[in-house]
Amino acid sequence: MSEKIHITQNSGNVDHTVEALGHAISGGVAGMAAIALTYPFSTVSTRLQVQQKKQQQGQQSEITTVPYKNSIDAFKRIIKEENWRTLYSGLKSALIGIGASSFVYYYWYTLLKSISLKLKNKQELGTIENLAIAALAGCANVLTTLPIWVVNTRLQINSDKGIVGQFKYIIKNEGFGGLYKGLIPALILVSNPSVQFVSYEKLRALWRRQSGRTKLGGLEVFILGAIAKLIAGIVTYPYLLVKSRLQSQSGNASNPESQQQQYKGTLDAIGKIFKSDGFLGFFKGMPSKMVQTVIGAAFMFLVKDKVVIHAVAILFYLKRLLNKNNKRV
């Protein structure tokens, strides 16, 4: 998170709204920059997450997903058997998704935090309060943007249909509910940014106390952001894998994609994954995902810290101009 921006104007909640909007814009910009930088790792991780073992003989059907040995093998084979552009399949939907997700998350997180600080007349919130606010912001984010991520997951596996085509296909064959597959694990994954941001703020506060400085340098922000994301990623990765499995499956039995093992819901998916792959099956694709999320989160914090100050300043300037024009009228 950026250094706290002090608000000196006396326009009440409007100031909180403007500040929240500045954080939302900077978060969206930073999120898109980060995912554009690390997207191939996300594609590889998704391929590994949805990959399943072949069923034993005698069972009804055999899963035909091409098995990758590990992240490096997946990188090599995707480039060799398909082409390097495949690593960027679904990038457009991912940019839309991360832009919208970051905007919604940062807007509500900043707004709720600012209002809470004002009501409690405090400079900093406690860990529980921070977690609660982060969770509320995360739920708003999931409910708003989950359909985009369902489409993105499908495109990373099969990019033939495109964004609009994939939306239409899901609605036609699976109904509107198909766009919300994986909702329960996605809501559980709200704890990921909650753990991430609380860890970051606690690490930042500790760093500032130890160094005796109030402003962190770019490298320090990058390192703390990476550590915070690593902590959150390890804790919540199994839920991410379950979410990817649920989102990747098609409700159309005639579709080749549906030849993968079908899950009735979250608990059914957890049980079947554990039965077929064991405990380690919940961590498939984790190395490439950790590279993507840790570097991406660190880069996002770095970019957001640089952008947010200017974004909030511009918004306050525009607000003052608007107020002056209204007074003239």
From Swiss-Prot:
Induction (free text): Down-regulated by phagocytic stimuli.
Keyword line: Membrane, Peroxisome, Repeat, Transmembrane, Transmembrane helix, Transport
Subcellular location: Peroxisome membrane
Gene3D superfamilies: Mitochondrial carrier domain
InterPro entries tied to this protein: Mito/Peroxisomal_Carrier, Mitochondrial_sb/sol_carrier, Mt_carrier_dom_sf
MF GO annotations: ADP transmembrane transporter activity; AMP transmembrane transporter activity; ATP transmembrane transporter activity; coenzyme A transmembrane transporter activity; FAD transmembrane transporter activity; FMN transmembrane transporter activity; NAD transmembrane transporter activity
Solcar repeats mapped onto the chain: 18-115, 125-206, 216-310
UniProt GO cellular component terms: peroxisomal membrane; peroxisome
Pfam families: Mito_carr (PF00153)
Chief localization: membrane
Membrane-topology descriptor: Multi-pass membrane protein
Listed transmembrane segments: 21-41, 95-115, 131-151, 175-195, 221-241, 298-318
Record's function text: May have transport activity.
PANTHER family: PEROXISOMAL MEMBRANE PROTEIN PMP34 (PTHR45939:SF5), PEROXISOMAL MEMBRANE PROTEIN PMP34-RELATED (PTHR45939)
Family the entry assigns: Belongs to the mitochondrial carrier (TC 2.A.29) family.
Protein name as it appears in the record: Mitochondrial substrate carrier family protein Q
Native organism: Dictyostelium discoideum (Social amoeba)
This protein's encoding gene: mcfQ
